[in-house]
Amino acid sequence: MTNRKITIAEMIAQKLKVRGVQRMFGVPGGGSSLDLIDATAQHGIEFHLSKREDSAVMMAAVTAEMSGAPGVALTTKGPGTANAVNGVAYASLDRSSVVVFTDGFSPAIKKYVTHQVFDQKALLEPVTKAHGLLESDDPTLEFEELLDQASSPPFGPVHVELISAVARKEILIPEDHKLPKKDKTPNQLMVDEASVLLATANQPVIVVGLEARSLDIAKQIDSLINKLNCPSLVTYKAKGVIADDHPNYVGIFTGGKAEQSCVSQADLIILIGMDPVELILQPWPYNAPVLDISEVNHTPHYSTPNTGLYGPLVKSLEAIEGNAQLSKWVSEEIVMHKSDMITRLTFPVENDLNPQSIVELAQSAAVHNPRATVDAGAHMISATAFWKVSQPNDLLISNGLATMGFAVPAAVAAALEDPERGAIAFTGDGGFMMCASELALAAQTNANIVVIVFNDGALSLIDIKQKSRNLSRRGTTWPRPDFAKVAEGLGCQSWRVDTVEDYKVTLEKAFKVKGPALIDVVVDPQGYGEQLTSLRG
């Protein structure tokens, strides 16, 4: 034990640096957040001032998803914590390892103060894995345990409520404070059962989910697919785990209608890293046996797996691959199912400038292979179906929470994490209006992003549902703003287009910009309803 003393804020900075944290996001107040910003700066951790707290947590979460290190966000107490909730819910339901620091109120102050005071722990408790005050006898161990909880499957946020007095408190720190790591191995009985299912299946289908978003897992999945030669699908967040140009790739799995013609022919459905948080609100439609290979046993689940292998995915896949045999699928059938999926999701309105062409033309013009970030809304169907990717996290989306206001902050975070590739954000006008202010951070950091706004003057998905119930059109539309002017005011180069010719020319300009750019695309929403029905039923 060393006699050297450091503050708890300094200890936090040290531990974050050891875990690989390079940047954090937030909106500080006058308390512990200032101590954290100062302490982390001494360890080379950059602080980025977001414009909203929920965006800050989303940026931290996306950083975690891309880097593998915990994401870090901080807020002030009271309104800062309240504003952060949607971002914390994203980290929770989209399974991102995030540490959320909020300031707090000391017991002495709570005796007489009610201004901004509420139970912050209780507010965030439903969407956090753990809470800590770092007031125990060993705050270093307490913080290490919180970090481990955030980084243990299912990944998620932890809440550190830190008052100024605690942040500045001096402590003795051990020379080495490592926690033992648990090394899980697959249950042999379950491996044997899974092996029997694999060996006896003639027409298996693989469905890959968000837990599989790493290169080593993707490689192991590819090996299994090649052995089985079977149709393979991914959830939205797993897009890229199987490359779009892979001969066995069929398309997106949502739990809806579009994939049923393929999956209904399976005599074994193999779920790999598939967290049911990603599926739509419909009952499981398949009768085939289910083999669930996942980091954890998720409950409740849409299906009732016949066998489950729970633990590290690579080890589970290695344990069963030797029993995989060439299926009776023929390659032409798999190609047919992929073609059928594309036909179902093709935008049904013949207009040169439509959601599908907006996405496809953007990819043709993109010169640095940017990552795509996709907001919730009707445009996401075209964005996820027709933006082609080849690696995990090439496309970033909120699918557990499915929140709007995600694509722009996610693009900023992605560009900061990987400046060379940068990012392209596909967002509806409704979602963009929720987070447009983050373009100021993009301009401040000269983030390599291009934002494509689908400007249709409506909450199109809700508009579709309203019409389907034969209700009057109320509360779902607005006059179309000029988002190019908004972006210009926030420091970005921007254009507004309403023809495909102008869009093509503008894309070339946007991808040449050294910094953030935005294209406000006036688009006709007709066709979204038919496309949605084809996808979900």
Question: What are the residue ranges of the model-derived segments?
Answer:
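Thiamine diphosphate
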Residues: 109-116, 301, 310, 381-537
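N-terminal alpha/beta PP-like core and its mobile active-site loop of ThDP/TPP-dependent enzymes
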Residues: 2-325, 361, 365-368, 448-451, ...
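Active-site-proximal structural scaffolding
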Residues: 225, 262-263, 355, 435, ...
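Active-site diphosphate/adenylate-binding microenvironment
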Residues: 9, 19-22, 27-40, 337-414, ...
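Active-site nucleophile and cofactor-binding loops and adjacent substrate-binding regions
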Residues: 27-29, 48-58, 73-80, 375-376, ...
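Hydrophobic "anchor" residues on beta-strands that sit immediately upstream
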Residues: 99, 371, 424-425
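Phosphate/pyrophosphate-binding active-site segments
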Residues: 1-4, 134, 161-162, 173-175, ...
